Structure formats: structure tokens, C-alpha cells
Amino acid sequence: MTTTRAKSKFQSLSACRFTPLPEPNTSPSTYSKTLPKPNSSPGTDGTFPTPFPLAVITPIKTLKSVTLSDWWLTKKGKDLCIKGFESNGASGVRLFSSGTISKRHESTTLEAIDGITISINGFINRSRCLENGISIEVCNRFRLGFPYDWEDYNEEEEEKKKKNVDISFDDIPVNRYQDLYSLEGCLKDKILDDVVGSLRDLVCQKSDKACEKSRVGDVDDDDDDDDDKSLVSRVVGVKTRGMLRRREEYEASIGKRVATMSGKRVVTVSKKKNRRRSFGW
């Protein structure tokens, strides 16, 4: 009995040891999903088709000339550069980044500082230019290519930067705010009066010169009596307080002259009458 049991155990162990494993199911549903092959161009260099990341930049060591179908402007400090897509036919499309533009052969043919000749086709890409800090005015000037006065771009941009200096209240220190708020009302009014007075003086100087010119012309053309009337009626200047005050003073002086002239005439007439009476005429 013991021997038969031992044989049966040995047979069961050998059967478990030598039993072949079941074959795997080779149905298509059990295959692992493979990544699709990249959609590479027929060329041998394996470049990416568009769209592709802008980090893929064409090496420019071996290039002598480049033709860009889509181009835009960039800046390196104060200098202008060009970026764009280079079309190589079967090789695909690559991104080209130039050095500083040093020479203009034609509006669409340029030369970089490293000696590469760049030909551009089509209109400028405005959206790319704006992303790189180029203004709309410059985009309009470089719309079809480089104008003949393209080198003046840097000077104009520098002048605009100097003129367009933004002044903000944040630039004023806090202690100045405190000084302004602590001023008394009379001092503020005095400062305002000084500012208005300086502006008034500037306006009066210009208007006085115009009045003098008109007075000289009127004196040469008319008589003395007509001059006084014409000066009063024709003087037209900036209507400020200073001008009105001077006009009133001038009219008053003219009135005094007329009064003195009429007074002298009355005195002479009365003297003549007295003489006639004394002689009995």
C-alpha cells in the first residue's frame, strides 16, 4: 500500500512538472498598441513637417543664401534681424534665424553680418513682429520688404523712446506727497497764481508784438485822429486779464488826449470872446 501511494505521488509530481504550458492567445486584441510612426517627409534628413516647434532652427554655418517664404523682423539690441521659414522642396520647411542685417541690395534681397544673402517673398508677418516687440508703424514701412531708408529705423526708435518717457505718480517720493498735503491754502493759491502769471506774461509778449506791428502800419496810412480811432477798433489780441487791463489803460489815455484837446479849444474860444468884448466889437 505504501509503495503504491508513493508511486502515485511521484507520477502526479512528474505530470505537473512536465505538463506543457497553455499557448498564449494570439488574437489581435492582445497586441500592445504601438506608437504611430512620425509623419516624416520623404527626405533623408528626417526633418519635421509644419507645424513644428520654433526651437528647431536651421544651422547657418554652411549656408550662403536663403529664401524665406514667411518672414518677420526681430531685434538684437538696437539692430534688426530676420526670422522666417525656409522652403527646401523635398527637404521640408525649416526655421531660419539671421544675424544682424548689414546691407540692402534690393527691397527683397539683404545681406547679414555673417555674409549670408537673404531673399524674402510675400508680405511681412505682422503677428510675429508684434510678438517680438516691433511696432505697427515699422510693420507698415517694412510690409513689402526693406525700404531704402531702413537704417534710419534705429535713430527714429531711439528718439521715440526718449520722447515717450512715461511719468507716473509712483515716481514721486512719499515725502513730496506729504509736503504737498501739508501746505496751507494760501501757499497753494500763491503757487497757482505764479504759474498762471508766467503763462499770462508769455501770451502777452506775443500779443504785444502783434499789436506793435499793426500800430506801425496804421500810423503810416492814416492821419493822427483817424489813427486813434483805428487803433482802438482794430487791436484784437488774446483776451486775457493783462490784455484787457492794457486796453482799458490805452483807451483811457486816448480819452484824456481828446479831453485836453477839447479843453484847449474851449479856452482859446473864450479868450477870443473876452478880447472882443473888451474892444467893444
From Swiss-Prot:
Keywords for the protein's UniProt record, in alphabetical order: Developmental protein
Record flagged with keyword Membrane: no
Residue span, SANTA domain: 66-153
Region (Disordered): 1-47
Pfam families in alphabetical order: SANTA
Annotated Polar residues bias: 1-14, 24-41
Highest taxon listed in the record's lineage: Eukaryota
Keyword Cytoplasm: no
Protein task: Required for normal embryo development.
Protein name: Protein EMBRYO DEFECTIVE 1674
Lineage, opening ranks: Eukaryota, Viridiplantae, Streptophyta, Embryophyta, Tracheophyta
